[in-house]
From Swiss-Prot:
Similarity remark: Belongs to the bacterial ribosomal protein bL33 family.
Protein name in the entry: Large ribosomal subunit protein bL33A
The UniProt record lists the keyword Isomerase: no
Source species taxonomy: Bacteria, Bacillati, Actinomycetota, Actinomycetes, Pseudonocardiales
SUPFAM superfamilies listed in its UniProt record: Zn-binding ribosomal proteins (SSF57829)
Record HAMAP family: Ribosomal_bL33
Organism: Saccharopolyspora erythraea (strain ATCC 11635 / DSM 40517 / JCM 4748 / NBRC 13426 / NCIMB 8594 / NRRL 2338)
Any one GO biological process: translation
Amino acid sequence: MASNDVRPVIKLRSTAGTGHTYVTRKNRRNDPDRMRLRKYDPVIRAHVEYREER
């Protein structure tokens, strides 16, 4: 049931290799592909790209 949810919970993992993650929800109908956002990584104290992890 949860796997067919329209707004599933996803993890956004830092591409800087620090292991830092953000947890958010996304709308599958509007964003069917993997999400990529530029967000702040507090480990390296800089903005880096975060990618959706499955």
